[in-house]
């Protein structure tokens, strides 16, 4: 039986967060793709298959919410997990309204994120 590669895109303007998530994802058996901006992700999007996305809400330039809207409008939004370091009481509800599968405030437990990715990909593949 051949193992299925699960590509997980990470979009965060903090390079250290991208590196940490890349290591965690790789150690958990995922294939990480990291981007420091929404614009960089969009440039690469036609060439990559993304099974799940970890998306920072507050990016320089286009925000995570704006990127999610653009992907949804194009009909190409993978399951999205929003992350943020901002402690704003309205943000979790805004993230849910945007259609995310989960929302995590930094810092968050890595094992919970990995469980969420597995569940999101399994749910998407069962449809």
List each language-model region with its residue ranges.
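Acidic catalytic/metal-coordinating carboxylates
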Residues: 36-37, 63-66
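C-terminal output helix
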Residues: 90, 108-118
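Short amphipathic alpha-helix used as the core "switch/output" element in two-component signaling
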Residues: 65-76
